[in-house]
């Protein structure tokens, strides 16, 4: 959603250039939390429309989004231009209620999807079904990725080919074939290299750290030099623990230290995003000196930040490439001030990776014995080992020159996996094919036409993502006996929400004071929530309530 919000901000400044001056198209933000974005809310035509749905020309916000499109997610794609999460389009080819409205909204439109390499096996198969349907309806699809493997590309090409009812096979690519354009039409397949501008070429050296103590020392050195530095951790608990260690060590002043992860209420998350952009964003200047951010994957793609130095936990190679893109992203002088042109005056960028000691013949517990939480977050340990191997061999991430080599050395079909990961590799392959098969069952079968036989699944069981179930939590304060939202201002209850994994909540729910009994019943009646499923956490003193604006939801962690 953060990525969609950022793109909406950019599109809002340019989208009218796509239309004639006298046109009145609508620009919609299509995701479930759009009501929380002020700029979108301000763009909705506030006048009462009727008949032709023409807005009042004197209305300053009339060049935005008609209210009729904005009052329901199922109608969002009917707007002329939409920016949102891919889920909103994927629901068109799954048995969700009103999926026909979404299909209608996609008709005669170009579907443009970015960062498609991030789709897991389930989402990739749903995306293939969406692409096939787009092609069969005569619509264009544009897919973008900086780290797409050849295997993924071939599946996407095959999906579009099925839609246009012709059999094509994209040519094999060499390690130097990047950037690359593949175009499939009803009559031909074009596959060719794309020229890149010299100014977008980047080179980031790789360094290795093998203990958290070494990482903390590096942070201290960066702060002493006046550099800003980020440490991207793979788990929330690891991020919080290091944040606390830095606070206790006094290496970094509290006001220069920031923590950012997914277990913050929307209210605090928006504030932290703004702080992050102010301290580490493109326009940051003197205020960035000596600043430290400990974060998780939330800053990999959605925020345009620019760090002088960076540490990352070992992660799959495509994610490390994304993280490296937040290191010295913009040209600056030696004091960290943005330059319009010329050479960057900072030290050579180095992505330092916290990883296990290198082992040519790793055992099954190679990763879990050194980085337990990372092993849980990224269970394909063989790909993690392959990532470390290729980065050790190359020593540098050179973009775009080495992109294909790096990706295919980890995700290619012909990679040699160590014997120690044989069991893990079998489990991962089994899960991959199982997830794809399950996703195939969830796709609508359009062949019989508009009838009950197009799906055997029930809409209430649908999800665009195959992931562990999450729990929605509301944060509340008790003021003079009255239950009030944690956040203030407009949409206060929505801004007081956060979501956590079901397993995490089952493990930690006993550590929180929760609303129950008659107060919970009254709250549910007021907020139109189901009493059997609603969970409201009472926020009081941080030491006992398990939530703070600076650390997020942690329970009794470390107690």
Predicted regions and their residues:
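Conserved RecA-like ASCE P-loop NTPase motor core of nucleic-acid helicases/translocases
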Residues: 1-4, 142-144, 228-234
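Short basic/glycine-enriched coil/helix segment immediately N-terminal to the Walker B
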Residues: 75-79, 95-111, 286-290
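C-terminal helicase lobe and adjacent C-terminal extensions/tails of nucleic-acid helicase motors
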Residues: 153, 213, 217-220, 224-283, ...
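Conserved Walker A/P-loop ATP-binding site and its immediately adjacent core
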Residues: 1-16, 27-38, 148-152
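SF2 helicase motor core recognition
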Residues: 285-288, 293-310, 325
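Conserved interdomain linker/interface between the two RecA-like ATPase lobes of SF2 helicase motors
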Residues: 165-239
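Post-DEXD/H (motif II) to motif III coupling segment of the RecA-like Helicase ATP-binding lobe
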Residues: 104-110, 117-192
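Inter-Walker segment of RecA-like/P-loop motor cores
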Residues: 20-95
């Amino acid at each position: 959603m953060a990525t969609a919000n950022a793109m909406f901000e950019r599109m809002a400044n340019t989208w009218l250039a796509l239309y004639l001056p006298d046109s009145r198209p609508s620009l919609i933000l299509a995701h479930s939390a759009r009501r929380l974005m002020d700029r979108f809310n301000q763009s909705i035509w506030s006048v009462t429309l009727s008949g032709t749905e023409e807005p009042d020309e004197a209305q300053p916000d009339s060049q935005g989004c008609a209210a009729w499109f904005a009052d329901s997610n199922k109608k969002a794609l009917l707007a002329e231009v939409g920016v949102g999460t891919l889920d909103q389009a994927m629901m068109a080819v799954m048995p969700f209620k009103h999926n026909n409205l979404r299909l209608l909204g996609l008709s005669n439109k170009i579907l443009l999807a970015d960062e498609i390499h991030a789709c897991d096996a389930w989402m990739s198969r749903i995306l293939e079904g969406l692409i096939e349907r787009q092609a069969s309806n005569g619509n264009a699809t544009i897919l973008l990725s900086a780290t797409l493997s050849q295997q993924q590309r071939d599946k996407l090409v095959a999906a579009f080919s099925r839609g246009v009812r012709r059999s094509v096979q994209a040519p094999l690519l060499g390690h130097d074939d990047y950037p690359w354009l593949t175009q499939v039409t009803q009559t031909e397949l074009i596959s060719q290299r794309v020229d890149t501008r010299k100014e977008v070429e980047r080179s980031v050296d790789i360094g290795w750290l093998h203990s958290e103590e070494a990482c903390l020392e590096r942070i201290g050195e960066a702060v002493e030099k006046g550099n800003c530095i980020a440490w991207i951790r793979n788990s929330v608990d690891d991020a919080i623990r290091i944040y606390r260690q830095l606070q206790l060590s006094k290496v970094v002043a509290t006001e220069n230290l920031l923590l950012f992860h997914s277990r913050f209420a929307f209210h605090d998350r928006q504030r932290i995003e703004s702080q992050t952009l102010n301290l580490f964003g493109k326009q940051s200047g003197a205020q960035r000196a000596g600043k430290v951010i400990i974060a998780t994957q939330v800053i990999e793609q959605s925020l345009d930040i620019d760090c002088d130095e960076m540490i990352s936990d070992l992660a799959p190679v495509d994610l490390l490439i994304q993280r490296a893109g937040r290191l010295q992203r913009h040209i600056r002088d030696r004091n960290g001030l943005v330059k319009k042109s010329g050479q960057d005056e900072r030290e050579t960028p180095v992505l330092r990776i916290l990883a296990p000691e290198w082992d040519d013949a790793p055992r099954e517990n190679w990763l879990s014995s050194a980085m337990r939480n990372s092993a849980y977050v990224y269970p394909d340990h063989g790909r993690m080992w392959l990532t470390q191997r290729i980065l050790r061999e190359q020593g540098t991430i050179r973009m775009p020159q080495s992109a294909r080599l790096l990706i295919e050395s980890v995700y290619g079909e012909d990679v040699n996996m160590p014997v120690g990961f044989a069991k893990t590799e079998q489990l991962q392959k089994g899960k991959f094919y199982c997830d794809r098969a399950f996703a195939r069952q969830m796709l609508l079968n359009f062949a019989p036409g508009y009838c009950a036989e197009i799906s055997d699944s029930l809409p209430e069981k649908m999800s665009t993502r195959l992931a562990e179930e999450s729990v929605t939590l509301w944060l509340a304060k008790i003021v003079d006996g009255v239950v009030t939202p944690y956040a203030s201002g407009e949409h206060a209850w929505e801004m007081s929400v956060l979501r956590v994994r079901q397993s995490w909540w089952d493990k930690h729910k006993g550590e929180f004071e929760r609303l129950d009994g008659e107060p919970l019943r009254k709250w549910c009646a007021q907020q139109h929530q189901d009493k059997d499923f609603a969970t409201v956490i009472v926020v009081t003193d941080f030491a006992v309530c398990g939530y703070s604006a600076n650390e997020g939801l942690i329970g009794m962690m470390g107690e």
